[in-house]
Amino acid sequence: MRASGAGRPSQLRVLGQHLTHMPTILRQNFANGFLPGPGGICKAFDLVTRQHLNTDMPWWSLPETIRAAALCWRESADAETQQACLQIWTACHNAFFAHFIRPEVHLMSIQTRCEGGSVSDSIPATADADPGYHTGLS
């Protein structure tokens, strides 16, 4: 793992030990949760039944997946893995800019969309960490 100064040496060692598994986890979780039609990542997926439990798609899942894909792409030496990471990165980028960004309100994102693609009234997270934002009051 390339050191970026973002973590302590002990944290980077632990991350480095698990880094080889990250592209596999990324690919499977993306396959489980990405809804290509409406362009987003669902909130919950049941690993036993292989069904979406909550098809609401919060905005933040896409940039977080882009970050994971970028890390896996950067750290992988395998061309096939790098290509898969770029495909995930591209799909998330395109979905975010096509379906979540709102130019009419200074590029603010839609918080949550439903499976049909329309804006959902659902609040994407709990309000304890950031009461203003997560309640739509900020």
Regions found by a protein language model. Name each.
Residues 1-138:
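Glycan-recognition and catalytic cores of secretory/periplasmic carbohydrate-active enzymes
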